[in-house]
Amino acid sequence: MTTLDPAIAGRLKRNPDGLVPAVVQQHDTGEVLMLGWMDDEALARTLTTGRATYWSRSRQEYWLKGETSGHVQWVKEVRLDCDGDTILVKVDQVGAACHTGDRTCFDADLLSGADRPGPDARG
C-alpha cells in the first residue's frame, strides 16, 4: 500500500465511496481522453510510479492503465481543481485511451454544439 501525502489527502473532497473523478487529458494537445476514478491509494500510486492508476468501480479493484492492453498512460502532470473535488491528469497516451479501442472516450456521440452559432454570430 502506498501512502498519499497528508497535505494532498487533506485537500481532496471525495464522494461517499471515497472516490474523486479524474479527467485525463493528452498533455501536449489538450485532447480529453477519458474520465476515471481515484481514491487516495490510486492517486498515490499514480504520483509515485508516473503511470496512471485508477479504481475500477465495476471490478472493485485497482487498474493500472495499459497493464493488459499495452495502452499505457505516462503521467506528465497532475493537478487538483480549485474545489478539491476533481483531479486533472495530463498524460502521454500510448494507443487507445478508451476500452472500445478509440483514442478517446469522447469521440463517438456529439450531443450538441456543432450547429450552434458562435458569439460573433448572435448579433
UniProtKB/Swiss-Prot annotation:
UniProt remark on cofactor binding: Binds 1 Mg(2+) ion per subunit.
Keyword Zinc: yes
EC number: 3.5.4.19
UniProt: Mg(2+) binding residues: 81, 83, 85
Domain of life: Bacteria
GO MF entries: magnesium ion binding; phosphoribosyl-AMP cyclohydrolase activity; zinc ion binding
NCBIfam families xref list: PRK00051.1
UniProt GO cellular component terms: cytoplasm
Species name: Nocardioides sp. (strain ATCC BAA-499 / JS614)
Known role: Catalyzes the hydrolysis of the adenine ring of phosphoribosyl-AMP.
Enzyme class: hydrolase
Cofactor(s) recorded in Swiss-Prot or TrEMBL: Mg(2+); Zn(2+)
Keywords from the UniProt entry: Amino-acid biosynthesis, Cytoplasm, Histidine biosynthesis, Hydrolase, Magnesium, Metal-binding, Zinc
Protein name as it appears in the record: Phosphoribosyl-AMP cyclohydrolase
HAMAP family hit by this protein: HisI
Keyword Amino-acid biosynthesis among record annotations: yes
